[in-house]
UniProtKB/Swiss-Prot annotation:
Belongs to the ATPase alpha/beta chains family. The gene is atpA. Its EC number is 7.1.2.2. GO terms for biological process: proton motive force-driven plasma membrane ATP synthesis. SUPFAM superfamilies: P-loop containing nucleoside triphosphate hydrolases (SSF52540). ATP binds at G239, P240, F241, G242, A243, G244, K245, T246. It catalyses: ATP + H2O + 4 H(+)(in) = ADP + phosphate + 5 H(+)(out). This is V-type ATP synthase alpha chain. Produces ATP from ADP in the presence of a proton gradient across the membrane. The V-type alpha chain is a catalytic subunit. Keywords: ATP synthesis, ATP-binding, Hydrogen ion transport, Ion transport, Nucleotide-binding, Translocase, Transport. PANTHER family: H(+)-TRANSPORTING TWO-SECTOR ATPASE, V-TYPE PROTON ATPASE CATALYTIC SUBUNIT A. It is an enzyme of class 7 (translocase). One of its GO terms (molecular function) is proton-transporting ATP synthase activity, rotational mechanism. The keyword Transcription regulation does not apply.
Amino acid sequence: MTKTKGKVVGINGNMISVSFEGLVTLNEVGYVEVGSKKLKSEVIRIRGEVAQLQVFEITKGIKVGDIVEFTGDLLSVELGPGLLGQVYDGLQNPLPELAEQAGYFLERGIYLNALSRTAKWHFTPSAKEGDTLKRADLLGTVPEGSFTHRIMIPFNMYGTYKLKSIKPEGDYTVDDTIAEVTDERGNVIPLTMSFKWPVKRAIDCYAERLKPTETLVTKMRTMDTFFPVAKGGTYCIPGPFGAGKTVLQHATSRNADVDIVIIAACGERAGEVVETLTEFPELKDPKTGRTLMERTIIICNTSSMPVAAREASVYTGVTLAEYYRQMGLDVLLLADSTSRWAQALREMSGRLEEIPGEEAFPAYLESYIAAFYERAGIVRLSDGSKGSVTIGGTVSPAGGNFEEPVTQATLKVVGAFHGLSRERSDARKYPAIHPLDSWSKYPSVLPLEQVKYGRSFLRRGTEVEQMMKVVGEEGTSIEDFIIYLKGDLLDAVYLQQNSFDKVDDAVSVERQQHIYNILIEILGTSFKFVSKDEARSYFSKLKLMFIDYNYSPWGSDAFKSHEDGIKKHIAEKADSLDERAKKLLKQAV
């Protein structure tokens, strides 16, 4: 089949208009010839015989009359063994190899294979000759790090196939033919270990989509207890600049109870990506004891790279996540930041001269954001195993204004909202998730009634604090002042975590439940205080005791002695325990 060719008839920034004769489809890849180089671009609109393409490189040097060659392929990623531990740009070019070939500053027009053509993988066949197979069925497996990588029938092969031949166990490259299948018409199709899949099409080779109910344990107390995320769920982290969005995502990627983490750094500062690249190879995965980099894929399209590739980087990340979900693995995709992706959409929409929506974002922004988050989910595969993709996206609203279109469109589709507050980050309260503005629709690691009880003290404590700002401490009753101190204690010792401390950085569910029960006892106890000063000094001492308690390894002698000290300190001034707290503690036992 001859490839369609066209000519450039107009240039507007990184968008070019091309007149063509023949067949061109939306999202098809085209290459613009500039001298000896070919620049990759994607068809974003077709009107009659003129197509608009967004170029993924700087368009300097392109002129009217330049030749554009359409490939006939949609914008796709290559799927196969060897993805884990890689660092890609938004178009799935491996950056370490690019640096070797082109130096530290990216040259345009250089595109490399996403998977190594020389690395050999030990293939073990599972299917037998004569088997009837359909897309996503298992041909065999190869070990990839600590995972078993499934080699499957390509997802774009619809219909049924008969396995004609399959290679015996041995070492092969991703280009070697490992099997041959016959289609319903008798055509023989050779299969390798890798294949391509369009990034903007969701992978749907599963038997059933399930409701996310199992909590994704992040080992962050505030997230697991108060604002949980489910495996296969979605959540967003909006917050002003410098409030700790990226740091929170890094902590989640280190400690979350998932098999694979994919970080899509979309339009963020390069320094943050560099931090991940230097940190992850040195960090140990608590499950396997190997480096975190072995279970991580990083797609970085930093703010210094072309804007057009930002949109592609988000879709590349979610497609790789769906691919590993097909192997029955739990995948966490962290998109940082979806605001930059939305800005890339806005820029393209402006160039296409579409009618703008609010704040000049395209009118279809909501449906684009919804379509992206809908690709998350927990699924049951045809062999009965389960896999999940959990998506966490940060939003960077200008000035921390949560009323802007990207935040509002995201809030409509996500299952949990972790709103970061400038006030909390300035007060060095980490993580800076606002305990009253944030919410979650997913089940917590603790019983719902216990969580509600704790939140009621946070809310009432904040109300008393606001009242004290107006009438002063003198105009507040001692009962209200104690409620304020209890809310402040819960915030300081449970919601806040020290990520620089080895013990406090990652807190197991058992430890969270244990500490929370002690806090329920404190919250439900009425204390005998003569004055507010006595109450303040009592709770200050309790706070310091709890911080030492949090830094003691679970089950150690120091942990037990700190706990005994806390219980003794509570008994000194305790009067009685309210009925609701008694009931909650009985349930916990």
